[in-house]
Amino acid sequence: MEKKYISIGKEEIAYLDEGAGDVVLMVHGNMSSSVHYEPLITRLKDKYRCIALDLRGFGDSSYNNRFDTLDELADDVALFIDALELGPVYLVGWSNGGGVSLKLCAKYPDKVLKFFDIEGAGLKGYPVYQKENYQSTGKPYASKEDMAQDPIQVLPAIKCFEKGDFATMTAIWDATIYTVNKPTREQNELWMAETLKQRNLVDLDWALANLNMSDEYTPYGLGDGSIHNIKCPVALTMADKDIVVPTYMVMDNYNALGALAILLPYENCGHSPMVDCPDKLAKDVDEFFSR
């Protein structure tokens, strides 16, 4: 699969575009890119036009402007949809891409027909708290600069990116993402090369920590209530061996979305159903979008 490029505003977005039919737009997670969707694209492209983009600062997309919120990335996706004249799309989001997609659904309801959320970020964000003796204090960071020095969740990954440390990044993924199955050697080499292209980790971690679409407070502040602006049907996967996005985050999303949402429990599956159960995932995506 070869990437194409299109300009949106001040950024150039790289993307994969495979197959024909109704458009399925795929939004990737943190430490990844469009290429991580290849197992799903391969299984869906005979029926759908599968488009997966590299978000700003990921993969081969530009990073001309920093960002503070997932709203800004959702705005990029909306501009991308318009630039390619896609019309309303079937949307897939994975991990952080689930958070970006929730924002897209809330801000641009006319652009999304249905949303399939794969182990997506919770509507109350993914907190990174201050540390004392390498233990979380539950206190929020006051700035990106302070968060960048977090000795557990942020700084080690920054050093991996700076060094292009393939071995350490692979070990991180093996320990946290691939908790059930492992990718092939060829897949891992390709996907890790894409992972190491990320340049925006601090922006992304800050945006995720501050995400709050609920009506409630988190240590980072009061939510904006934007979850109530979502109008489309949403399917949520809930994998029993995911140690990145815990079950309570998926349930928070499910409960907040009410009658719009359906819950899809995945047994013996970790944070990447694309690796742990790609056939089941593709079947569920197709059935949900075909209803």
Predicted regions and their residues:
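Catalytic active-site module of serine/aspartate enzymes centered on a nucleophile-bearing elbow/loop
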Residues: 259-291
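Flexible "cap/lid" loop of the alpha/beta hydrolase fold
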Residues: 115-160
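Conserved acidic catalytic loop of the alpha/beta-hydrolase fold
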Residues: 71-89
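Conserved hydrolase catalytic core segment
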Residues: 87-134
